Structures are given as structure tokens and as C-alpha cells.
Amino acid sequence: MDYRNQSLGALAIAIPRATKLFRQHQLDFCCGGKQTLLRAANKLNLDIDALEAQLSALQTEPHSSEDWQQQPLTNLISFIISRYHDRHREQLPELVLMAEKVERVHGDKPTCPRGLAAELSAILEELTQHMYKEEQILFPMIQRGMGSQASGPIFVMEAEHDAVGQQLDVVKQLTQNVTPPEGACNTWRALYTGINEFITDLMEHIHLENNLLFPRALRGE
């Protein structure tokens, strides 16, 4: 199979566990899902042959992931809300509290991620509004079979996905790519573990919307 000339989004759909591989190599398969594997690898000076070999191995492994290309869009929407929207509503307030504690207790340390709590608070506020608009406006349109008429709302949602992707870049910069320093306390380590989980969840969430739900809706499925 020719992997290098396929888009990251298409590969993430065809090979569900490719998302973990892409995340390990900092390959943006959600907001940047339209770029080819070759182009993305070249930008990061990654070995394209090694990536193709890893993808080939993943594709031959058995897996039990849901095939969302075949499921009705109403099922996909229900999954996105229960698995990602509801989860983000639980994750972010707790992450903000932990970040505030780390900055308050360790603010005198050079490794302290100053500004992290404020950035996470901004993500919480904007993502809360974003998910509300999806649940109250866009998703009902799609569920009523009006997805082909939803290009305007979809364009706005994709732009907001790009914006939160940029906010995640700031979080990574503040946290040394979400790596706790030597000697970090338990709260600090738990905070970074939670941030990593949130980033993984959010990237998979955006991938399902940008690369599966929205294109299928626009095709009138």
C-alpha cells in the first residue's frame, strides 16, 4: 500500500492505531490531516521509510475499533458527545485547578510552567462554547439530514479546531513538551499526565470531526 502519498487524515481513518504513532512523532493528523504523510514527515525530518514500515505493521494487526466510515452519522455524533465532549468537561476544570496549585507552590522554580493555568482556562472557556455550538446548532442539522447545507457552520467549527490546536502548541511550549522536570511533585506529574491524556483525546476528537463527520455530512450522507 502506498502510504506516503496519502493524507494523514485518510491514514488515521484506515488504520485506527496510526493515531498513536502520529502523536509519538508530532504528526498533526487532526487539524493538519489534509497534508500527505510524505510532506508532514519531510517537515519534521522523519524517516519516511521507517514510518511506512510501522504503518504497514499496524495495518496487519487485528483490531476491534469501530468503523465509523460505515456507521450512521447519528451514531458517530452520539459517540463524539459521550466519549469526547463529556470527557473534556470533566478533564479541563481539574487540570486548571492542578495547574494553579503547581504555579502557586512552585512559582519560584525556573522550571515552573508560569501561565499554564491561564492558558488551560482559556482552552476550557473556548472549548466549552465550541462544543455547545456543535451540540445545539451543527449536530442537530446533521441529524436532520441537512449536513449538505451546513458548510458555513462546519467552516466555523474547523477554524475553531485550528485555534485550539494553536493553544495546545502554547501548552507544549510552557511544559517542555509536557515533560515534568526532575524532582517534580506528585501534583505536577499528575497534571502533566492529565494534559497528555487531554491532548490525545482532543486530537482524536478533532480527527473524527474534521476527517470523518464533516466530510460525510457535506456529502449528504
Curated annotation (Swiss-Prot):
User: Where the protein is mainly located, per its record?
Assistant: cytoplasm
Protein name, UniProt field: Iron-sulfur cluster repair protein YtfE
Q: Which UniProt keywords apply?
A: Cytoplasm, Iron, Metal-binding, Stress response
A GO CC term assigned to this protein in UniProt:
cytoplasm
Similarity-based family: Belongs to the RIC family. YtfE subfamily.
TM segments?
A: none
The entry's function note states: Di-iron-containing protein involved in the repair of iron-sulfur clusters damaged by oxidative and nitrosative stress conditions.
* Annotated source species: Yersinia pseudotuberculosis serotype O:1b (strain IP 31758)
* PANTHER family xref list: IRON-SULFUR CLUSTER REPAIR PROTEIN YTFE
Subcellular location per the Swiss-Prot or TrEMBL entry: Cytoplasm
**Which NCBIfam families does the record match to this protein?**
FeS_repair_RIC, PRK10992.1
Pfam families reported in the protein's UniProt record: Hemerythrin (PF01814), ScdA_N (PF04405)
Q: Where is the signal peptide?
A: none
Quaternary arrangement and interactors, per the entry?
Answer: Homodimer.
GO terms in the biological process aspect are: protein repair; response to nitrosative stress; response to oxidative stress
- Superkingdom of the source species: Bacteria
The record's listing under InterPro entries reads:
FeS-repair_YftE, Hemerythrin-like, RIC_family
